[in-house]
Curated annotation (Swiss-Prot):
Lineage: Bacteria, Bacillati, Chloroflexota, Dehalococcoidia, Dehalococcoidales
UniProt protein name: Probable nicotinate-nucleotide adenylyltransferase
Coiled coil location: none
EC number, as in UniProt: 2.7.7.18
InterPro entries membership: Cyt_trans-like (IPR004821), NadD/NMNAT (IPR005248), Rossmann-like_a/b/a_fold (IPR014729)
Pathway it works in: Cofactor biosynthesis; NAD(+) biosynthesis; deamido-NAD(+) from nicotinate D-ribonucleotide: step 1/1
Superkingdom per UniProt: Bacteria
Gene field: nadD
Membrane-crossing segments per the record: none
Length: 204
């Protein structure tokens, strides 16, 4: 059986934006991945004190954003799970759901790579997948040797990419919408229409 190379891109996607899509396209191309699965978070443990948009809206926006791209798909496994969202649990679930020979490539920003040694079951994460670390605007490149000291084995599981650097964030999109500004080119057209139709991110 031929191995399937599957990228995993998790996030709150509140909302999904063009930066997420550019990133996914670039990683797929650079690493020769067969597909990328977008996984909207339930209630991330690191955002437990923050209000995020309803899971159904975030899931629907991802579906709209990736429509027409057969190598992109979305799974709601974290949304369906009760309690906090942990990456190690998601990767274990994917190992059970996906075909046996699937190789997982977990995509994360340099900022999250820096924090990885403090993540729940971090050593299990690096055992279950290849990490694909991508730059974040304004984020210095992490010291991988130092991180490997904190989390032995990390370097063997790590692919560091120097691009794409995408200057778009969900918080920027939300801020512009709250201020009544346009978000053309920041989110796909279908997502912008959904946001408008459902009155998301507008000041009450």
């Amino acid at each position: 059986m031929v191995s399937l190379k599957t990228g995993i891109l998790g996030g709150t996607f509140d909302p999904i934006h063009t930066g997420h899509l550019i990133l996914a396209e670039e990683v797929k191309k650079r690493l020769g991945l067969d597909e990328i699965i977008f996984i909207p978070t339930g209630q991330p443990y690191y955002k437990a004190d923050k209000t995020i948009s309803p899971a159904a809206d975030r899931l629907n926006m991802v579906k709209l954003a990736i429509s027409g791209k057969p190598y992109f798909r979305v799974m709601d496994i974290e949304i369906k799970r009760s309690g906090p969202t942990y990456t190690a649990d998601t990767l274990n679930d994917l190992k059970l759901i996906l075909p046996e020979k699937t190789e997982l490539y977990f995509i994360l920003g340099w900022d999250n790579l820096e924090a990885l040694p403090r993540w729940h079951k971090a050593s299990e994460i690096i055992r279950l997948c290849q990490l694909v670390a991508v730059p974040r605007i304004g984020q210095a490149k992490p010291d991988v040797d130092e991180l490997d000291d904190k989390l032995p084995g990390l370097q063997q599981s790590l692919i560091m990419l120097s691009k794409p650097e995408v200057d778009v964030s969900s918080s920027l999109v939300r801020e512009r919408l709250e201020n009544g500004q346009g978000v053309e080119h920041l989110v796909p057209e279908a997502v912008a229409a959904y946001i408008k139709e459902h009155g998301l991110y507008h000041r009450q």
